[in-house]
Structures are given as structure tokens and as C-alpha cells.
């Protein structure tokens, strides 16, 4: 089957922002104006097309990334609407990994907010070109220029307006396109009709100056415009458009547009900007892949062998497991086999679906640039590479996900539900790489861990709604970590040689802090002192002990272990003996390597009237917090930002409401790990102390 759209006419984009900036409403308006839906839904009414989970409709927030496709002026736009709440940052992360461009939505009153900074940083990590859409221009306190300035100062982004608003707040009526130098107003029952008007006289000079500033901003990336400016020649809209596009795609420039999605103003022009300035799959650098540890690139072309990345797993009540994927090369027809090159497993593609939020359309094939879903893959999880059977094996660049920072115990109401609970939790863990579940060895309790209290609330809610499992939930607990601060060489022995076949494992390992994140295992055994077949077991013994912890039962992170000496016995040595010997070495190293406890430090932003600012800052300090910044917004609210240990933030919402007479709100997200102060660490370690292995 031939292509309906050339690859250059694809736009794979994400809508990203801070919570309540209007992402989902913006996506709804795009679908309405492109003819994908015929009735506009509102998130506050609980009838939004893109928010399809029950919890999303009730809470008016986006939890999972819904995918859909729209068509505009001969272009195919694949859209992923991502969550703005910090607890669901993994959804943003995995969406950005498979997108070619993004629309960053700002609230015109607030400008850049804390979660804007997070998603912007994620987009920068994946080199995703962006346009900025300043939404809610009709809101009290809306300020287009201040919003642009906040992108420059807080995000260090070269943001330049390509539009000028006509009026603001209640007087926001339209906009001026600075590229074309045309003005537009809006009419109709929902103001969905856009029509051209003369540029208002009182704004003509300002618009001309802003167009010149725009040309000067892109002149650094376009020689023709640079020369035209020098020679004071006219710069045509086509020239300016081409220069903006080139600068945006390289990530050097962020065009800024404005509007009010709720009022339908500026949405069509924003869709035009997506088409004009964001890249197609052929405009971005080829995707990186690895073949036998050698880096290669994959060309975006139907003529190449099929390759795709699984970026999301979802359990659907009607069809079962859905694997969302992005095709990077080649063509795949349903009914064929593919290889999961990450796991070395063969999978059969029975059905392929094109998705629209939670509705679906069955299709026969997918091609380069497509985003779709496979039904019923058995072994594939988020981040896995999928390639054709014929392809010489390679793995696409993987996604990295943060570890959970908060945990709770779960206890089913009846013993009959224990197995049901375990099955349900495993399905949810397969969907979400930042959600972990395990059984506490000491207490036998089921533990769930995630990115925040809301994250775990949603998990418990889904257990009840989707799997009909009810459970008692324990108090939230901080997910501490352990690490080492010094180097030491330690011996580990496991020798039992009395009667029958014995056990013999003997290692010398140097432990040191790993300057990079993660675990590095280095084998420096020479002369056959330990046979090669036991080396993997030694590494596994260390990894298992790291997971169990050596100080207070929390996972040990950022460790480098160099195996440099040891001995073996011809008869009594075994993989198990060396695994235990390695585990004992790490246990024995606990004091010598200066093991310490780490705690998650949160980025906290508190919004409160200025008269409460002193009380708020004092309270944060009492919680071991470090206040980093204070600013007054255009609506008079004070924003106080700081770093506070998660352990001190439980119950904070109740305290804040009491302190501010119900007028304060806050948001927080994980920032980094820090060493726990000794007086607090000593108490935690005493409660959970691990005995050193004999």
C-alpha cells in the first residue's frame, strides 16, 4: 500500500506544560479545528476527548499520554498530550523520546512555572525543537511579553515573538502575525471563526519594530537575511519563515505565539506554526542505535529494514495489552514476526491499531514516522527496540527513568485477593517504569513505590476500578538510598569443607564511590586466579547485595567494584559460593567505605498571598528546607521556591492551609539525593540496622 503522506509532511509533536496551563484544552481545540472531533470537550466538565481514564475525568488532569492524529493543510500531525503533574513525569519523558517537536504551553499570567522547567529540561535532553504557545491571554494578569522574558531568564531559551497580541485580559481580541504582517480577529458563537483585519494603527509601529527584532534574531542563522538587514532591503515573509524554521529545527531558536485555547483565539495560527516551524522525521538527525556496542545511525526511510521503539505499555479492558510504538524506519504489515532486540525475543504482530485517545482503528501496516499500537505482544516493555527479522540486530538508544522516591505498604482485605493483587500490581508495573512493587522480606508486606503521593493514590484507585482489588494502604514512607564515601579493599570468603562436597569462594574486591551514576563492575583477574565462569556470579552477588543494602536495608547506589584477586578450589568452587563470597565482601566493607544514608530532596514551590510569606519561609526552614528564591507574580501572589527533604513534607498541605487561612497551595518534584544529617541517620539506622554477614 502506497504512502498517503510523504514523510516530509509528517509532524510528530507533543503538547507539554505545567499543570493547568491548558494543554489538554489546547489539544482538544486542535482536534476541533482540524475536523477530528465535531464537539468541543472541556476538562473542567469531565468530557475531554484526550483525558479518557476515569481518574482523569474526575480530577481534570492528564495522567497518561493520549495519542491521536490530525490533518491540517496537507500535513499529518501525530499528537501526544502529556501530563503536567510532576508525579507523572515518566509520561512526559517517554513521549519526548519519540517526538520530533513539541509545543510548550505557558499560562500567560504565570509564565514559566516549576513543571515547565522540568519538561523543558527533558525536551532539551532529547534535543526536541519547540515552539512556545502563551495560552490564557484572556486571563486577569495575562502578560505576553513577561511570559517571553520568563522563557529567556528561567529556561535560558532564545525565545522570540512571531506574533503580537491585540489587547490582553478581558480585552484580548486577536493577534498580529509578524511574519506576514497581517492581523486577525475572531467571531462566532465560540469565537471559532478567524478573519483578517487591518493592523490597528496604535500597534503598527510596535509590530514593525518587533518584526525587525525577529529578523535580527534569525539573521545569525541565515546569511540572506543578514545581508538584507545590512543593505536595508525588504525581508519577504517566505525568507523569514524559512529562516525561523531552520533556526527552530537546530534548537537555537524558540518562536512564540499567543492565544486563548478556551476562547478558540489563536489556535489555528498555532497549528500553522506547528506546520511551518517544527520538523518532519526527515529534518531531524538520524536516530542513534547500537550494534555490538558500536554506535550506528538509522536513516528515516521506508526503504530501510523495520525498526521501532516501544515507548508505552497499556492494559486495555477490551483488547488486553497494548504496546505503543514509534516507527523509525521501514514498513511493517500485520501478521508478521518482529524481533525484540533488547530482550532477544521473537514477537508476532497480530493486530496494529491507530489510536485516538481511547478509541482505535485497525490498520494493515505502519511506515516510517508512524505512531501506533500493537496488540498482545508478550515480552515487550517500555524502552525496548523492535526490528524486522531480516535486520542485522541492533538496539535503539534506551530511555532512562527516575527511581521512585516514596513507598507505601498494601494489604488486601482478604487472603483470597492476595494473588489477584500481585497480578494486578505486576500489570501496572509493566505499564509504568517509575512504579515498583515488591514483598518486604522481613514483614511479608506488599510494598508499592512511585514518584509521589498522587502517583500512588492513582495506582490504588486503579486497583479498585480496573482490577476490583481493595487494599488497606499504609502511611507513605521515604525511599532512602545508601552510598559509599571512601575506597577500601575488602576480602570476601565463603568456605565450607566438612563432609561431602564443600563450598569454596574467595574474592578480593576494591570498592570506591562511582563518579558516574549507577554500578560499575571491573574484572581485573589475571593468571586464572578465578575462572571466567565464576565472574558473572560475583557481579550478580554484588548487585543483589546492593539491592538489599548494607546499612539500613535501602538500595545501595553509585558504586564501583574492581575484582582484583581471589582463589578457587578445583572441586568445591561453584557459582553459588562465589556469589555469596562477593555479597559477604560488600557487607564487610560497610564501615571501611564510609556508608551513608541518602534522602530525596524535593523542589518545592509555595504559592501564597504576600502577607503569609514570612510564615511560609519560616516553616520551610524548620523543615530543614533551603529557600532559594522568592518572587511576586502579576496577580499579587508570592511564589517561594526552595529545596526541602521529602521526609519533612508529609502532611504539609494541611499545615499550609492552616498557616494561610486556606489560601496557599504548593507543588513539589524530586530534585536530587543528599546525605541525611547524622543525628537523623543514626535513628533510622538503629531502627533498621543490618547485621554484618558472618
Curated annotation (Swiss-Prot):
The keyword Protein biosynthesis applies. It is found in: Cytoplasm. GO terms for biological process: ribosome disassembly. Residues 8-282 form the tr-type G domain. Keywords: Cytoplasm, Elongation factor, GTP-binding, Nucleotide-binding, Protein biosynthesis. Its main location: cytoplasm. Pfam families: EFG_C, EFG_III, EFG_IV, GTP_EFTU, GTP_EFTU_D2. GO terms for molecular function: GTP binding; GTPase activity; translation elongation factor activity. SMART domains: EFG_C (SM00838), EFG_IV (SM00889). GO terms for cellular component: cytoplasm. GTP binds at residues 17-24, 81-85, 135-138. Catalyzes the GTP-dependent ribosomal translocation step during translation elongation. During this step, the ribosome changes from the pre-translocational (PRE) to the post-translocational (POST) state as the newly formed A-site-bound peptidyl-tRNA and P-site-bound deacylated tRNA move to the P and E sites, respectively. Catalyzes the coordinated movement of the two tRNA molecules, the mRNA and conformational changes in the ribosome. Belongs to the TRAFAC class translation factor GTPase superfamily. Classic translation factor GTPase family. EF-G/EF-2 subfamily. This is Elongation factor G. The gene is fusA.
